């Protein structure tokens, strides 16, 4: 950012305002802007005490008092800053996912989940026959991030099923 963007400009409307323009239909825009600037000037000369109470006596101005126009600008700056932080975090996450597109062998692939976890017969069946393929397919769609992730996951699972069937046929033929 430039320094001119960071420093507040006096007598300029820096905060976009939404207002009812139906009553201002016949008034030129320049006059409306001049009136807005006058309102900001008046407001900047008013004082607030430590509790936020309003008084017009500038002799009672305290060090920590802040005009509300400055507070509005500060809130807008904070919201823009928070949005930028969120964008940066998500963009760095995406770059990490793209860089890790090479398949990595997990230590858990060689673990017999059914024996390790135990549980009901249904849980053992799912852990043996479904979960490893489902997790591998979910890793695939997390890396690729396709437009239709469910279709890609389904096609991957069908492909794995065909590979398992052909592997069983080959093992039966060799016996």
UniProtKB/Swiss-Prot annotation:
Superkingdom field: Eukaryota
Major localisation: nucleus
Biased segments, Polar residues type: 1-12
Keywords: Nucleus
Residue ranges, annotated region (DPY-30): 121-162
Region (Disordered): 1-45
Gene Ontology CC: one annotated term: chromosome, telomeric region
Biological process (GO), any one: subtelomeric heterochromatin formation
Location of the protein in the cell: Nucleus
Compositional bias of kind Basic and acidic residues: 32-45
Keyword Transferase: no
InterPro entries: Dpy-30_motif, DPY30_SDC1_DD
General remark: Present with 937 molecules/cell in log phase SD medium.
Family: Belongs to the dpy-30 family.
Biological role: Component of the Set1C/COMPASS complex that specifically mono-, di- and trimethylates histone H3 to form H3K4me1/2/3, which subsequently plays a role in telomere length maintenance and transcription elongation regulation. COMPASS recognizes ubiquitinated H2B on one face of the nucleosome which stimulates the methylation of H3 on the opposing face.
Record note on quaternary structure: Component of the Set1C/COMPASS complex which consists of SET1(2), BRE2(2), SPP1(2), SDC1(1), SHG1(1), SWD1(1), SWD2(1), and SWD3(1). Interacts directly with BRE2.
Protein name from the UniProt record: COMPASS component SDC1
Species of origin: Saccharomyces cerevisiae (strain ATCC 204508 / S288c) (Baker's yeast)
